[in-house]
A protein has these predicted regions:
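N-terminal pre-catalytic "stem/leader" segment of glycosyltransferase-like enzymes
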Residues: 1-95
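Extended catalytic core of nucleotide-activated donor transferases of GT-like folds
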Residues: 9, 63-142
């Protein structure tokens, strides 16, 4: 019981001190501008400016950051991690933001201890890309931002 209390106390302290992690799952546009990715990077950059520990997650070997076309965001200041190559440690106080187009990521991360939040930018994708018989609820996504 004491171990659980210590863990809870540690996670609460991370929230108070802004040392928890805020992950954003992003996709590779290969240099092509994207409005939805602009929103994600602007949000991530703003949170970093406020002192939060922001990290961008992706899965591609040849991932290109959007700094060639995204001029109003300091993309270089945001760490980019390839989740297929690097070990990502996630705790209960962390947040993972997942664009609605990544139902597969929602499914693969549903047992993670962090708070997972969908980023809904296109209403059509909310149900179109989710597996048959699944819902955000069955994928343990209970919150979204638009």
């Amino acid at each position: 019981m004491n171990e659980k209390i210590e863990t809870i106390t540690r996670e609460i302290q991370k929230l108070k001190e802004k040392t928890f992690k805020v992950f954003f799952f992003v996709y590779n546009t290969k240099g092509v501008p994207s409005g939805s990715l602009t929103y994600i990077y602007q949000t991530a950059s703003y949170l970093k400016e406020l002192g939060y520990n922001v990290q961008m997650l992706h899965t591609e070997e040849d991932f290109q950051t959007p700094e060639t076309w995204l001029n109003n965001v300091d993309v270089a200041s945001l760490p980019h991690l390839n989740i297929q190559k690097e070990k990502i440690e996630v705790s209960a106080s962390d947040f993972l933001f997942i664009p609605e187009i990544f139902a597969d990521v929602m499914a693969k991360t549903k047992e993670m201890p962090c708070k997972r939040v969908a980023i809904l930018q296109n209403y059509d994708f909310m149900t179109e890309l989710i597996p048959v018989g699944a819902s955000w609820n069955t994928l343990k996504i209970h919150d979204c931002v638009t």
